[in-house]
């Protein structure tokens, strides 16, 4: 028995010796010249990462044997399991391969390579989940997002100075929109796994009071989509009408309770198509993962709406008209600052409109658009009788056109200025009937507001006790007047076909410009697996 005890003690001592030796070798490995050379070689194309390691005496983030390194690597591998949750390109990070390489590394050279590999994947993942997978302008030049990308050094320094949990928890967008979109994504994935919404739809327009099998088809479709409780009635009753109206409201349709082609078209969208919209919206949220401003304006182009928020609360909203879905007239996406308001504005007709639209018409009829003044290079008004329009073409026409202030001015009585390279602004319009339409894409790119006066009052509230009086006084002059905002207001022209409204309810809109379809295809090319998983592409609608 004593012999066995001796053998046991010797074995224990040897075991502890080998553990100590292994740890010593590991420590020596990460402090060796070989480790540094391997790390530097693997990071040779990332000068910022090299600078970080040099500043920290090449102390490893991942492969050290201290507890902090173990916590970082363990939490990072855990975090990579959530890539599909956020609709990120899972295979791009290849967590299984990373983990295998991490576990197999023994020599200084191997540890240096793994340290560099984990750092590279960490930086890629962090950037992707925080500020997006794609570069917006590479998908569509009209998406002009100035994304506040973080530097490599900032990522590495922050990650090294806080707990992994704290770092990763705050990485993805913290907005209400992003959180709700993740919930909707999960819901849609469950629906798809159960076979989707496949259901036969009616072939004819249905109204309240109608009776028959077509009504049953409509009812069943709305039951499957969660708008009605199970019911087998063949009558288009009040409950069905309210369900149709609710569906219409949440899909940007006139809530008239009549099920026609537009309503059937939206009901007919598959769960896969809706999921594609959500995936794109998640990427778009990552592009705008910055402070929108305590007081800011959101112009959602597919929703044809303009909203003013203050401290997270909606304080004003109005319908709008956006650019037509043709080249050079689509409204771009960007962020800026509303600096001032101009009442009784003069409309200086953009040169492209003058040459492409008005010049041909004036060549046929010199009095066409006679409400527009001809302006020469000296900014003097020239009588039309002095000009032979047929002497010129697009390249030689020397005049500009402008419309003087009036209630019939194309800009109405007020415009809201955020000076930008696209000459885009918000403005009034004399064409009020357009706001009654569902699809309101009729402008040359600028945004027309249904309630511009009320919008002006809200913008002026922080700087005057009587904003209405101040604004109306400027209007009453009949002359072009500039009213500056003492505190400029951020304005964001966004494009969301899937979003959450102020009640926390998911809404969907048509892809009026086809931008989401292009983004979805680009995401597929970047490696997200939605196409293979869900089998459908996002269709352009409009």
Please name every model-derived segment.
Residues 3-14:
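Bacterial N-terminal signal peptides that target proteins for export
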């Amino acid at each position: 028995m004593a012999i066995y005890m001796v053998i046991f003690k010797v074995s224990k001592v040897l075991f502890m010796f080998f553990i100590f030796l292994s740890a010593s070798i590991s420590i020596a490995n990460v402090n060796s010249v070989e480790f540094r050379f391997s790390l530097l070689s693997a990071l040779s194309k990332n000068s910022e990462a090299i600078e970080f390691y040099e500043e920290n005496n090449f102390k490893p983030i991942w492969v050290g044997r201290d507890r902090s390194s173990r916590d970082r690597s363990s939490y990072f591998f855990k975090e990579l399991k959530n890539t599909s949750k956020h609709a990120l390109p899972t295979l791009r990070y290849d967590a299984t391969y990373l983990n295998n390489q991490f576990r197999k590394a023994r020599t200084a050279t191997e540890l240096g390579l793994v340290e560099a590999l984990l750092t590279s994947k960490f930086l890629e993942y962090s950037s992707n989940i925080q500020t997006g997978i794609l570069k917006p302008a590479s998908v569509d030049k009209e998406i002009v997002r100035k994304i506040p990308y973080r530097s490599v050094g900032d990522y590495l320094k922050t990650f090294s100075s806080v707990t992994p949990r704290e770092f990763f928890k705050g990485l993805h967008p913290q907005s209400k929109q992003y959180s709700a979109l993740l919930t909707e994504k999960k819901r849609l994935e469950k629906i798809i796994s159960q076979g989707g919404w496949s259901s036969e739809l009616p072939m004819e327009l249905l109204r309240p009071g109608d009776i028959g099998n077509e009504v049953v088809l409509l009812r069943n479709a709305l039951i499957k989509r969660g708008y009605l409780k199970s019911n087998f009635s063949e009558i288009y009753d009040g409950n069905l009408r309210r369900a149709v109206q609710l569906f219409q409201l949440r899909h940007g349709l006139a809530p008239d309770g009549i099920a026609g082609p537009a309503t059937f078209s939206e009901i007919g969208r598959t769960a896969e198509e809706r999921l594609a919209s959500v995936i794109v919206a998640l990427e778009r949220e990552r592009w705008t993962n910055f402070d929108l401003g305590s007081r800011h304006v959101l112009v959602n182009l597919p929703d044809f709406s303009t909203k003013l928020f203050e401290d997270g609360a909606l304080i004003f909203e109005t319908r709008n008209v956006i650019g037509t879905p043709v080249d050079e007239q689509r409204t771009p996406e960007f962020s800026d600052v509303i600096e001032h308001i101009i009442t009784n504005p003069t409309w200086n007709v953009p040169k492209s409109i003058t040459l492409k639209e008005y010049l041909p018409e004036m060549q046929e009829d010199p009095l066409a658009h006679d409400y527009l003044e001809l302006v020469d290079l000296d900014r003097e008004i020239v009588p039309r009788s002095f000009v032979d329009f047929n002497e010129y073409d697009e390249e030689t026409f020397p005049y500009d056109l402008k419309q003087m202030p009036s209630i019939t001015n194309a800009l109405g009585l007020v415009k809201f200025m955020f000076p930008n390279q696209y000459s885009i602004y918000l403005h009034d319009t004399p064409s009020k009937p357009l706001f009654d339409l569902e699809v309101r894409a009729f402008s040359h790119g600028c945004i027309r507001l249904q309630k511009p006066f009320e919008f002006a009052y809200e913008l002026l509230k922080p700087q005057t006790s009587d904003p209405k009086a101040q604004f109306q006084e400027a209007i009453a002059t009949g002359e072009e007047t500039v009213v500056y905002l003492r505190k400029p207001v951020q304005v964001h022209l966004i494009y969301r076909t899937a979003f959450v409204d102020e009640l926390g309810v998911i809404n969907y809109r048509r892809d009026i410009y086809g931008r989401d379809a292009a983004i979805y295809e680009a995401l597929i090319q970047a490696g997200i697996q939605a196409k293979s998983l869900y089998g459908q592409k996002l269709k352009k609608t409009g």
